Amino acid sequence: MAPRPKGTSAGPKLYEERRLELGQSFQDGGEHYDRVRPGYPADSADWLLPEGARDAADIGAGTGKFAALLVERGLAVSAVDPSTDMLTQLRKTHPQVIALEGTAEATGLADSAFDVVSVAQAWHWCDPLAASTEIARILRPGGVIGLIWNQLDTSVPWVHRLSRIMHAGDVHKPDFRPVVGPEFAGLESHVTHWEDPVTPADILELVKSRSYYLRANDPTRAKVMGNLQWYLFEHLGHTEGEVVPLPYLTQSWRAWKA
């Protein structure tokens, strides 16, 4: 995401407008997003879930990448996303999930109905305080909020440069700590390092699912693709069809309803 504009009065307003503008870039392209975006490691869900959890809500669910892990663990899952296109894809791949249009700030879900609420790869599009209030409303007493991000592992030098070319704005700084509202306590984190086996063509398609690329004009898109092709094929020497282990880390956060 673009850095927060500096300033006193104009800055927050401009940042909010930019956040909403970038978020709109995911309204379409559910099939492509589902095909090219990675899933999440199993232990990110295992660590997140409270003992005895039965009912889960996945907010900003997209095409159901994280919801799939919840279903595999036997939970009844309700998924909420503002994109009709994303939910259409989710219903195709996970018909057992209840899929509803809504946002983290207005889910439309019932009071005190869930043991855990997950927000994977989406909290940065939300108003964290308003979303915290809404999520606390739908959680049962002692319920857990989980915030999950997949990001490229930029501690690996070649991946760091790749992320710069991709304009991967979701790579967090080491001191990153998400904002949650006063409804929650005991915020703690968990990190999983893993690799996704991909081809250079997969990486090129992955870039096309990023908000920076989706909102860019044609000349900017062409420049990004040209730089990326040079980096993968000429600088790194990869070939078409070669399987490349792409290092990721998944950063998970959880807190309990106070």
Positions of PLM-derived features:
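Conserved class I S-adenosyl-L-methionine
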Residues: 2-52
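Conserved Class I S-adenosyl-L-methionine
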Residues: 3, 179, 183-258
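Class I SAM-dependent methyltransferase SAM/SAH-binding core
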Residues: 55, 63-106
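Conserved beta-strand/loop positions that form the S-adenosyl-L-methionine
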Residues: 59
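A short acidic, Gly/Pro-enriched loop at the edge of an enzyme's catalytic core
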Residues: 105-116
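Short catalytic micro-motifs in class I SAM-dependent methyltransferases
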Residues: 121
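A short, conserved alpha-helix within the catalytic core of class I
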Residues: 126-134
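Conserved catalytic/acceptor-binding region of the Class I
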Residues: 133-198
